[in-house]
Amino acid sequence: KDCGEPAYLALRQQHWNCEFETSFIPHFCKESDCAGIAMVQSNENHLRAECYPQDSGVKLVVSLCKDGEDSCLAQMDLPAALPIKLKLRVEGLVASVLYQSNSEWKPVISDIDLRSLSTEHAGGFVGCTLGLYASGNGEDAGGYSDFERMTYRELPTN
């Protein structure tokens, strides 16, 4: 949503059912710094799973931007363990965001309606991208994040 200068490294979504996963270590300096993953159709229509600094560690916020309006779908405190591991699972027009704790993937939120990211709703012809995201949210970012890896894979169709 940051129309300033967010960092976004992405791959085009190539499969109806897929997973995008990353592992990263944030080095936040300001409260406005964030890092995570995103599924982007446009600046006005996208899904973000962002980690923000807080005194006790990291807060994960999942937001859906539809027609330029953000809505917070979920937020939770993450364990202080590093690196942070996030996954976005897409099955058709439904998504889930997960995080890894003690080698186990746990859901943050499931059944996210992605119809607002479709070309039928949002226009365009390219579709969506899935990628690594970092931003200062309109401020000069004081920190950075070390993204260790990103993985995209097709999920089997049921």
Where do the protein language model's features map onto the residues?
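Extracellular glycan-recognition regions
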Residues: 1-158
